[in-house]
Regions:
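Active-site-adjacent beta-strand/loop module that shapes the phosphate/pyrophosphate-binding cleft
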Residues: 71-97, 130-135
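Charged phosphate-binding loop/patch that engages nucleotide di/tri-phosphates or the phosphate backbone
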Residues: 129-167
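Short, well-ordered beta-strand micro-motif
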Residues: 12, 87-91, 109-112
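The catalytic Nudix box helix
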Residues: 33-66, 88
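NUDIX/MutT-family hydrolases
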Residues: 99-133, 164
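Conserved N-terminal beta-strand and adjoining loop/helix that marks the start
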Residues: 1-19, 37
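Residue-level preference for beta-strand/loop junctions
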Residues: 4, 29, 82-84
Length: 167
């Protein structure tokens, strides 16, 4: 491991048990949990609240630490740093989900944990499975996917963000 990046994410569910996911705008347009990098001198909990607000417009609080996931391996031949991701369970205190970081996120939508969209980041996949199983305090190493499937561009842009949130 040549370098390590620290990041945060959160599993946020609605009253129906659906999980809020973000679709990345760049690269393979992977689905992921809301979150981002931890800034210098910032606590993981503060970073999670800040990043969720910046990406989704939601005010949240962290309920518990779902786990710490170390993302390792190369992605499609790229030499990327390992990522140490603190993943929390979070509850919404206020606001309506909306894309607040259009340069980073193309859309937000709620998904049933049994019918998750693809392609998805391996960390999100593992964390959602752990959340559904009722686990907390998980310590897990997760390998990057070598070749994520690419969504069809027409399908990826067909659904408007507001319609996706209404599901």
């Amino acid at each position: 491991m040549s370098s390590l990046t620290s990041a945060v994410a959160a599993v946020i569910t609605d009253a129906a048990g659906r999980v809020l996911l973000c679709q990345l705008r760049q690269g393979h347009r992977l689905w992921c949990l809301p979150g981002g990098r931890i800034r210098q001198a910032e606590s993981p909990m503060h970073a999670a609240v800040r990043d969720i607000r910046e990406e989704t417009g939601l005010e949240t609080h962290m309920v518990d630490l779902l786990g710490i996931y170390q993302l390792t391996g190369d992605a499609c031949g790229e030499d990327l740093p390992d990522v140490l991701m603190h993943v929390f369970r979070a509850e919404i205190d206020g606001g309506e989900p909306s894309v607040n970081s259009p340069g980073r996120i193309s859309r937000l939508s709620w998904h049933d944990p049994d019918m998750l969209p693809e392609p998805m980041t391996p960390t999100a996949r593992a964390a959602i499975a752990d959340a559904v199983a009722g686990r907390s305090g998980v310590l897990r190493e997760v390998q990057r996917d070598k070749e994520p499937e690419l969504p069809d561009a027409d399908d990826a842009d067909a659904e408007q963000p507001a319609a996706a949130l209404a599901r």
